[in-house]
Each structure stands twice: as C-alpha cells, then as structure tokens.
C-alpha cells in the first residue's frame, strides 16, 4: 500500500451535491462518493460511508437540504410536512449519535422560522447546513487547542492512547480526540499515538492510523486487549477518546470497548478524557441508562473481509457502543474548556447548548 499525504476533508459541499470520503474503503483505497439525494445520504450514514457523531451531524444537515430541494410543492405547510417526513427517515439511521438529532432539529427550527417562499426556506436550510459544517471545524480546533493545556505536564512528550476514530474523518476535518492529539503534535507535546484496533469494524486500525500517516504523526497500533498491558509497562501517559452522546450527568456513550478502557485506565492511575463538542451533550437525558444503544449487523462480528472466522452454529451480540460512567472520566474536553463530568450543567445555564 502506497500512501499519498493529503489533507483530510471527509465532507465537501460542491455546487449542488455532497462529496464524501468513503470510509468503508480505507485504508486500501481512497475513494469518494457523490451524494445528490437525501435517500443516498441516509444510506451513506447507515452503512458508515460517513461516520462519527460530528460528521454525521454535518452530513445529515446537508441531507436535509437535499430532501428540501427535492420537494415538489410551493405550499409552505405541505413543504414543512414533507421536511419532517424526511427527518423521520434520518432519525432512524444511527440512533446513538446525538449530533444527528441535534442537526435535524436545528434545520427544522430554521425552516419553521423562515418567512417567505419555499425557495427562500430551501436557501435558508442550505446556509444553515454550511454554517454547521464550518462551525464544527472551528469547534474541533478549539477543543484541541484548549485541551493541550490540561494534559499531564510530565513527561514532556506524551504517549496518548485513543480508541476507534475520533479524528478528521469523524468530524468536519480536524477531529475531537484526534484533534487534541493533532494540537499536541503541533505544540511538541506528543511522543506518539497508541491506537486501539477497535473491533469489530477496526476503525482504529483502518482510519486512525491512516489519518496519522497522512500527517506523519508517529502511531503504534495495538489490539484492544493489549491496552492494560501497555499501561502497566508505562507506555501510556493519557487516554483521549471521543463521544457519540453524553448524558447530563457526564455518562458517555462511545464506541464499544471504551468502558473497558476506562476501567483499566483508572486501575493504572492514567487520566482518561472525553473530547466532544457541546452539541454531543444531551441534557434531555439524566444519565447513561437512557442512551439508546445501536445494535449492528452480526456479520461485523463473524466475518473479516470475505472470511468467516467461527462456526455457523454460534450466536452473536453486536452493540456498537457502550456507556462509560462519569466517575471513570477525568474530564470532558469541550470547545469552551475542560470540565469535570458533573459540571456540565453550567453550559446549559449559560445557554451555550
């Protein structure tokens, strides 16, 4: 495999359609797909051509515009009804990622508040989607820049372990957890990245390592069950992960395996941080028990590539996410700074969310 170094732009609005990096093809092939309808966007989200909570939020915003553009009525009320029907389809694609719901509600709010013709509402929806896209890029850079300040001061160059892919591919182009790592690398604070392979879809192996290679960031790939051993050997100084949904009390849903990582981090006195934009906090739910956990195709468990790895008689269970209790999280890194999980309420009070 020969890599060409490139800036990672997972989502691009181009004239009248969206261009996505097909993340199911990485790292073997760099391929883009053009999305011209809301149905195509729904499939892209469901099949993980695009994935990662912030990236899903940006993508669904554009998807809502594509759906708005496809409506065939000039009646405002009928248009809004059809737009809500499109929203229902998108809500069913990835139930755990709260950014998806956040972006949909923001689009619907703009559509309902915009006076004028259907065409003017469509234009307002597109401008909002573009704004969500740009805001996410700026937000992730702010998360990274602010978070570097609270990373452990010793050693001077840190080895940071991350899980799954919370990088440019999972956002508008900078990353949450990997955005923190990018900022640490820029500031000379990073020794190397340790990337969990992240079974069953291997986003750490396929996507996080690929991103690091694009920017010449030193990265070592380990299997998920090596994390505790690496910590005991003194190879890991901090853990930074992303999030798909954070409850009001700080309980955090992230890629399956994060909970285990949090337990072994605490056992070895290694800080574990969650890096996420405020849009990932769901104040409608009090704790992690209320977070819906997506279950995916069992083929992800029993098949690697085209090869089946176990007998056909075996049963399978494939939750895509787990919930890490707030007490196992050292801090939540946001665009407004890092706070303890129990301090999230201040953001709602300040109406930042």
UniProtKB/Swiss-Prot annotation:
Pathway listed: Amino-acid biosynthesis; L-methionine biosynthesis via salvage pathway; L-methionine from S-methyl-5-thio-alpha-D-ribose 1-phosphate: step 1/6
ATP-binding keyword on record: no
Entry EC number(s): 5.3.1.23
Superkingdom as given in the UniProt entry: Bacteria
Gene3D superfamilies given in the database record: translation initiation factor eif-2b, domain 1, Translation initiation factor eif-2b, domain 2
Active site: 244 (proton donor)
InterPro entries (alphabetical): IF-2B-related, IF-M1Pi, IF_2B-like_C, Initiation_fac_2B_a/b/d, M1Pi_N, NagB/RpiA_transferase-like
GO molecular function: S-methyl-5-thioribose-1-phosphate isomerase activity
Enzyme class, broadest EC rank: isomerase
Example GO BP: L-methionine salvage from methylthioadenosine
Signal peptide extent: none
Protein name: Methylthioribose-1-phosphate isomerase
Gene this protein is translated from: mtnA
């Amino acid at each position: 495999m020969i890599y060409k170094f490139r800036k990672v732009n997972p989502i691009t609005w181009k004239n009248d359609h969206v261009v996505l990096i097909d993340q199911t093809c990485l790292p073997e092939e760099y391929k883009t797909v053009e999305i011209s309808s809301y149905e195509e966007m729904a499939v892209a989200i469901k099949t993980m051509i695009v994935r990662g909570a912030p990236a899903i939020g940006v993508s669904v915003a554009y998807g809502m515009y594509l759906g708005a553009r496809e409506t065939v009525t000039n009646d405002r009320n009928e248009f809004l009804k059809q737009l809500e029907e499109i929203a229902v389809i998108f809500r069913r694609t990835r139930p755990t990622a709260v950014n998806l719901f956040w972006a949909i509600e923001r689009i619907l709010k703009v559509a309902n508040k915009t006076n004028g013709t259907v065409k003017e509402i469509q234009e307002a929806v597109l401008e909002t989607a573009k704004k969500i896209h740009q805001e996410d890029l700026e937000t992730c850079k702010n998360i990274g820049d602010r978070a570097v300040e609270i990373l452990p001061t010793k050693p001077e160059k840190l080895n940071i372990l991350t899980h799954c892919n919370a990088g440019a591919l999972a956002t508008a182009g900078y990353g949450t957890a990997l955005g923190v790592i990018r900022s640490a690398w820029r500031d000379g604070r990073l020794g190397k990245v340790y990337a969990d392979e992240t079974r069953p879809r291997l986003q750490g192996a396929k996507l996080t390592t690929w991103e690091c290679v694009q920017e010449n960031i030193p990265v070592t790939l380990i299997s998920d069950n090596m994390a505790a051993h690496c910590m005991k050997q003194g190879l890991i100084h901090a853990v930074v992960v992303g999030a798909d949904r954070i409850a009001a009390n700080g309980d955090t849903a992230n890629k399956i395996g994060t909970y285990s990582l949090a337990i072994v981090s605490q056992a070895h006195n290694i800080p574990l941080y969650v890096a996420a934009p405020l849009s990932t906090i769901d104040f409608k739910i009090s704790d992690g028990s209320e977070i819906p956990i997506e279950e995916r195709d069992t083929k992800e468990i029993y098949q690697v590539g085209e090869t089946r790895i176990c007998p056909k008689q075996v049963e399978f269970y494939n939750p895509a996410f787990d919930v890490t209790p707030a007490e196992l999280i050292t801090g939540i890194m946001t665009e407004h700074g890092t706070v303890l999980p129990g301090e999230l309420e201040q953001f709602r009070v300040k109406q930042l969310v």
